[in-house]
């Protein structure tokens, strides 16, 4: 069984620009670098979900539009989760604010799943 593809198929500057547009930020904003830092991790999260064989790796020219759109969504989700508190024992105490969990693939699964290949089966 081969490991899922980890190829970098995305265009980082284009993905960053699209995510900044969704967030209504510009290249000059303080958080622009933070948004850009989420591009590669978001792509690898999508690679894991796609579970593609490395032989079927996408290139920047062959990536489906839905997968590229999902990539922007995951980048935005990761950016929006930046200020969330980590889960802690305090979340279990009476009167404490419970920790929340942001699913980075929320809103992106419907775009990604039609392009999955092995579906976790070796």
Language model segments and positions:
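Divalent metal-cofactor coordination and adjacent catalytic microenvironments
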Residues: 1-122
């Amino acid at each position: 069984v081969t490991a899922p593809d980890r190829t970098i198929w995305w265009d980082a500057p284009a993905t960053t620009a699209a995510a900044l547009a969704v967030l209504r930020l510009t290249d000059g904003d303080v958080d622009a670098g933070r948004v850009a830092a989420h591009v590669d991790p978001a792509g690898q999260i999508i690679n894991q979900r796609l579970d593609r064989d490395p032989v079927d790796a996408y290139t920047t020219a062959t990536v489906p539009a839905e997968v590229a759109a999902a990539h922007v969504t995951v980048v935005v989700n990761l950016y929006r989760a930046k200020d969330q508190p980590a889960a802690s024992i305090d979340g279990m105490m009476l009167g404490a604010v419970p920790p929340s969990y942001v699913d980075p693939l929320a809103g992106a699964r419907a775009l990604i799943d039609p392009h999955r290949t092995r579906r976790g089966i070796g």
